[in-house]
Amino acid sequence: ENGELLVPMRYFRDNALLGIQTIRLVDNEWSKKMLPGMRAKGAVLRIGPQRAAETFFCEGYATGLSIDTALRLLRLNAVVVVCFSATNLIHVAGGMTGKRFVFADNDVSLTGEKAALATGLPWCMSDVQGEDANDLHARAGVMAVAKLLTEVSRAEP
């Protein structure tokens, strides 16, 4: 009714609901908020198949949707794990096993890159500062995202 998108935030180990992130357009800017008092550490949103051969971690919901679109285009059996923040991405990636990759945000502050490096996993990001996978998708198309995913998934951990 008020145009809010509600994104469930579930604990990465047992899928218990920890809270909700609300996303809405306010004055032509996207506003993201978590419900007061909720625990964000370990919170994720999984997008894609339940049983996947590969896992791609990212920070934001829109970023995750763009990565999932590219993965489906590539016909990869992979799940996207949206971690909601760079700090939480490090925590969650360290607590999961299997073939894992990171699509980092290319922040001016280098926060996304530092988080990707801290995981020790193969990672990629847009070469344009200030962009995440969703920005890259909007600017250059889904194939630009797919190209980076293909390159990083061929990397040795």
Identify the function of each model-found stretch:
Residues 1-55, 66-69, 73-74, 123:
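Basic, glycine-enriched DNA-binding surface that flanks or lies within the catalytic cores of DNA
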